[in-house]
């Protein structure tokens, strides 16, 4: 009788390889579902997992079947209603003959399948959410290091997933183990076989001694055969480790308008944008510094919690935030050693005489030293003087980008538009 002993340490993850293959195969449908789900989430749970639904038709597998046309006779088991040459009516369009949202009318016939729904983890969700995104114009200033990691081979390990198994190394270990476990028995077997051959040719015949030797030889051979050809102890997997790669250090300035003209819905959309930005930076680049600046009539550098949740408000003077950013850059972040980025969110409402000053500060002080400056305007109203001043900057500076957000659904597409990974030709 054969016995199978499951000694896998990661038995509960035995379908990991199949899961990864499924995520790769249906990446387009999963990313579409994620982009729709991100707009339905609250600010606090944007980095948790997600239930993803895929239409059943999209996950159908290819199969071999009879071609159309020709004459064929078929026997369908369980048929007690129809005979040959009967015409079967098509189910009515309103019936349940397919997947749907459940908003149609009821039907007494027809059948279909619901959409396929499965759960992805937090890490899988964030990987897909920020795929193909990067900080634009990142350069290696002074060869200062930022811990950006790349995967490298690092020998072998005794644990892993089946996709990483090393067949050659596992068989080498199997051979070494079987040699070590059976070496003594094989020497003893060789000695008994030599003794048996000597006795079998001697006179007079020693039948009892021959029978004893044959039994011992059979027992030794059985013991040798019971040593398994391969054991979990022999298995070796290719090991990979993440090593820091020489890269550049970066700082991201987050500027947000919290004036009285920003209603709660607009502030929530700005918070969503910056939370996406924070998750992206903290996940992609381990040592990126983030500077948070809130402003109304006065600007103030704050920590992360105060930036997102403080209730302080007031009038609107955007230039106060730009002046404070310029001061912080001069004090702490030398442009020759740091890649400086900035993202500004506002509803576009600003004191009219202040907008030309914003244009001047950006054109003369900030844009010459930053790698990339992005401005998002969150409003359903017509653009005002600040937007028009910034349009002149966009025409003059390649490192300045601006986008308009009207509704919550625009946040994620705009975020991807601003931080889309550049090709080699574009970055050059």
Curated annotation (Swiss-Prot):
The name this protein goes by in its record: UPF0229 protein YeaH
HAMAP family: UPF0229
Start-end of Gly residues biased regions: 92-103
Family stated for the protein in its record: Belongs to the UPF0229 family.
Comp. bias regions, Basic and acidic residues: 78-90
Region ranges (Disordered): 78-111
Classification via Pfam families: DUF444
NCBIfam families: PRK05325.1-2, PRK05325.1-3
Highest taxon in the source lineage: Bacteria
């Amino acid at each position: 009788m054969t016995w199978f002993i499951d000694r896998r340490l990661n038995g509960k993850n035995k379908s990991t390889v199949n899961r990864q293959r499924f995520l790769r195969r249906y990446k387009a449908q999963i990313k579409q579902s994620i982009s729709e789900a991100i707009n339905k989430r609250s600010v606090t749970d944007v980095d948790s997992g997600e239930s993803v639904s895929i239409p059943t038709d999209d996950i159908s597998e290819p199969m071999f079947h009879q071609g159309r046309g020709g004459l064929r006779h078929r026997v369908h088991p369980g048929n007690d209603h129809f005979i040959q040459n009967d015409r079967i009516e098509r189910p009515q369009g309103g019936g349940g003959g397919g997947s749907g949202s459940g908003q149609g009318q009821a039907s007494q016939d027809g059948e279909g399948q619901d959409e396929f729904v499965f759960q992805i983890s937090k890490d899988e969700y964030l990987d897909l959410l920020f795929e193909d995104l990067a900080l634009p114009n990142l350069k290696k200033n002074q060869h200062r290091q930022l811990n950006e990691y790349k995967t490298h081979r690092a020998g072998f390990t005794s644990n892993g997933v089946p996709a990483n198994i090393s067949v050659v190394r596992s068989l080498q270990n199997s051979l070494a183990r079987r040699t070590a476990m059976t070496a003594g028995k094989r020497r003893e077997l060789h000695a008994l076989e030599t003794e048996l051959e000597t006795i079998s040719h001697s006179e007079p015949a020693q039948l009892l001694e021959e029978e004893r030797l044959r039994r011992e030889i059979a027992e030794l051979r059985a013991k040798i055969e019971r040593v398994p050809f391969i054991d979990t102890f022999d298995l070796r997997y290719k090991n990979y480790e993440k090593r820091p790669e020489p890269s550049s250090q970066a700082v991201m300035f987050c500027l947000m308008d919290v004036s009285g003209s920003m209603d709660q819905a607009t502030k929530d959309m700005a918070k969503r944008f910056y939370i996406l930005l924070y998750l992206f930076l903290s996940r992609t680049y381990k040592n990126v510094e983030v500077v948070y600046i809130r402003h109304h009539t006065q600007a103030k550098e704050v920590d992360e919690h105060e930036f997102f949740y403080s209730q302080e408000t007031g009038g609107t003077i955007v230039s106060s935030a730009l002046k404070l950013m310029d001061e912080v850059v001069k004090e702490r972040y030398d442009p020759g050693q740091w890649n400086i980025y900035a993202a500004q969110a506002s509803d576009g409402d600003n004191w009219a005489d202040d907008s030309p000053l914003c244009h001047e500060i950006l054109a003369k002080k900030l844009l010459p030293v930053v790698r990339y400056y992005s401005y998002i305007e969150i409003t359903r109203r017509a653009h005002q003087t600040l937007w028009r001043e910034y349009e002149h900057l966009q025409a003059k500076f390649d490192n300045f980008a601006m986008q308009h957000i009207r509704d919550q659904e625009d946040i994620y597409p705009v975020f991807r538009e601003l931080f889309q990974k550049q090709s080699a030709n574009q970055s050059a």
